[in-house]
Amino acid sequence: DYIRFAARRSFPELKQRHLDDYQPLFRACRIDLGKTTEAADDTTSRMDKIRAGAADPHYTAQYFQYGRYLLIADSRPGTMAFNNHNIWLDDLKGRWRGRWTLNINIQACYWPAETTGLQSTTESLLSFIQDLSASGARTAKGNYGARGWTAHHGTDNWMNTALTDRVFSGMAPHMGAWLVQHLWEHYQFNPDLDYLRRIYPLLKGSAEFGLDMLVEEPTNKWLVSSPSGSPENGMALVNGRGLLHDGTPRPANAVRNTLTQGVAMDNQLLRDIFTQTTYAATQLGIDEDLRAEIAKALPRLPPHLIRDDGTLLEWIKPWKEFDPKHRHVSHLYAFYPSNQITRRGTPELAEAVRKSLVIRDDPAGWTGAWKINLHARLGDAERCFEVIRHMQT
């Protein structure tokens, strides 16, 4: 049908239709970093010169706009949400099965939406999360005996929300709470009560699931999510016992364990979703009982914790990481994209974020996008630009 539709129109007509649709979105945000003589070269030549050390600020601006182009092309009202490949998948069997990865990938795809004038691209994300929550409610009830809805680290066209693949990567039951952050951000940019009513069931369901997953931690009497894991990272075990961090390499006979409780990212996500649900319910004048339930649980979540080496704790105890330089930095969610930790408001915790990044600063692949934003919030322009250049080459 698409081909027949296109065949009835001339090339100039199709081009103009494309421009009319695309340019209002693309032109909603401009960035000007200046130009050098390299800007006149073709892309391959410019990349070669950047690898050789040349400065090409215009290329960096284009790199920024390319990310916006991908979102414009990939996520529009009536389409599926942006996933790991989307319209550029050229094989019937793509990597990661062509699915959505929910423990950072889909979130990073939508980071430019609100701040660069692409708010309309989040409509397909809202539809996606609504579909996902219906499946997630069955998983929450059937797998955990919990209210609300859940999603783990990956899903597909059938909206699978159960733990899939391995516990190592799959045990991340609060990824629904992370997805909903994009809807909350859209509301913050457009504080419309009708929109808040649309997204409130998703906020509420995620909060209810979070409440039902809480258990009391015996030492400090904190409420922690159990079971869970820090996305795709794990601690070192020897003979079934966890090892505490002591600055030494892990033993040769250590194995990786992910399954635990009270991981930092869970605490951070629950703090956000509980706070947002309370605010939304108050604005809408509903769910007093739920607000009261959250009010009891929220103060008992664990605080942000700092390890003896000054880094931010990834787990509730200072376990020895199986891979100290792991590419994921899930425990830094509170600094970006959340703002629970800030340089001005919580400088000691922000310094712990900085020290964590010193260890976890491999900018390869998708992880570079997260680390660019972390360095930007730290005010480290030099390192931020170093990561950008690394990704460009």
Residue ranges of predicted features:
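Acidic/polar, glycine-enriched structural segments that form the non-catalytic walls/loops
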Residues: 1-100, 118-123, 129-139, 282-286, ...
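Extended, hydrophobic/aromatic-rich amphipathic alpha-helical segments that build helical scaffolds
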Residues: 60-74, 176-185, 201, 205-210
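Beta-sheet entry/capping signal
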Residues: 61, 68-70, 221-224, 370
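Short, well-structured active-site flanking segments
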Residues: 76-85, 122-123, 190-197, 205, ...
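Acidic/His metal-coordination segments adjacent to aromatic residues that form catalytic metal sites
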Residues: 86-97, 151-171, 228-262, 318, ...
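Active-site core of glycosidic bond-cleaving carbohydrate-active enzymes
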Residues: 102-105, 113-138, 142, 158, ...
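Acidic/histidine-rich catalytic neighborhood
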Residues: 205, 209-280
